[in-house]
């Protein structure tokens, strides 16, 4: 039953009439806010019109990057006009994330997504030490701008297990550091499940990227794992992921990171997120 619709059944109680039909709330209704990556919007409109499109599709916010070429002024204007929040900036693997931190503060965001890249010419230990130094250097500016730096689990990182990523975050010893947990990346290049990553990262998780490469419509079935068993026709066992997120009382932003498109496509992504996140 679609929890976003009124129940159609009522119970007559004597002459008092029919009971009002309540709206069913999902497990994470009111706890997770829906977002997507700005690059997923594939329509030529003004920024305000694009944000209006997101609002109609039932999104609450969006993430941008320096590569999008958006000025802080136009972003703020679009947010004021639509109430679509720009909650974060995607930086990636570059060593200097100061510009991303500044942009995040200027648009009213709270986090910058950072990757700890694997350099082929370095050993695991040297990659670990190098990335720790890079992120540590960025912490003072992040703290000054009231922005958190979130490490994401990606294919190009040397952090190949949830345990390694948790240790990396813990060694930074800063409340400005957290985890950006990507549900799909856990399966694509590791032998661990999405729920295992969620369990190990636990309280470190600040935001979540929603992705399932094995899904027929919102993924790429050609990339589907032969061993991963999902609950939505793909690879991610969403019920187990939700269980782990609930165990740490997760609340915050979840961003779709799948193939984008026009208004109809983005509306479909939004509805899919409702389903897998139980919103």
Descriptions of predicted regions:
Residues 2-35, 40, 44-56, 108, ...:
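Histidine-acidic metal/acid-base catalytic patches
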Residues 10-19, 28, 68, 88-181, ...:
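Active-site acidic/histidine proton-transfer and metal-coordination neighborhood
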Residues 50-69:
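Catalytic domains of carbohydrate-active enzymes, especially glycoside hydrolases
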Residues 59, 84, 109, 147, ...:
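Short glycine/serine/threonine/alanine-rich loop segments
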Residues 63, 88, 113, 206-209, ...:
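Conserved beta-strand positions in the central sheet of alpha/beta enzyme cores
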Residues 71-89, 147:
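Short acidic, glycine/proline-enriched helix-loop-strand junctions
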Residues 72-78, 96-106, 193-203:
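Short amphipathic alpha-helices and their capping/turn segments at secondary-structure boundaries
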């Amino acid at each position: 039953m679609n929890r976003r619709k009124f129940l159609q059944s009522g119970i007559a109680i004597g002459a008092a009439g029919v009971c009002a039909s309540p709206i069913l709330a999902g497990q994470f209704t009111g706890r997770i806010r829906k977002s997507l990556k700005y690059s997923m919007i594939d329509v030529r409109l003004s920024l305000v019109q694009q944000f209006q499109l997101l609002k109609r599709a039932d999104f609450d916010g969006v993430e941008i990057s320096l590569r999008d070429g958006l000025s802080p002024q136009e972003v703020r204007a679009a947010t004021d006009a639509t109430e679509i929040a720009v909650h974060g900036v995607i930086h990636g693997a570059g060593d200097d994330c100061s510009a991303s931190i500044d942009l995040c503060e200027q648009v009213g965001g709270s986090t910058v997504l950072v990757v700890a890249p694997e350099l082929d010419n370095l050993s695991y230990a040297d990659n670990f030490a190098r990335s720790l130094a890079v992120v540590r250097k960025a912490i003072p500016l992040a703290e000054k701008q009231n922005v958190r730096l979130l490490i994401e689990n990606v294919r190009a990182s040397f952090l190949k297990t949830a345990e390694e990523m948790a240790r990396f975050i813990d060694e930074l010893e800063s409340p400005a550091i957290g985890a950006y947990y990507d549900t799909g990346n856990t399966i694509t290049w590791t032998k661990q499940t999405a729920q295992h990553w969620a369990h190990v990262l636990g309280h470190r998780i600040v935001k979540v990227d929603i992705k399932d490469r094995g899904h027929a419509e919102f993924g790429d079935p050609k990339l589907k794992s032969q061993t991963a068993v999902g609950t939505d026709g793909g690879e991610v066992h969403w019920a187990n992921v939700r269980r782990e997120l609930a165990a740490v009382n997760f609340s915050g932003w979840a961003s779709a990171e799948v193939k984008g498109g026009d208004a109809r496509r983005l509306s479909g992504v939004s509805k899919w997120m409702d389903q897998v996140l139980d919103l």
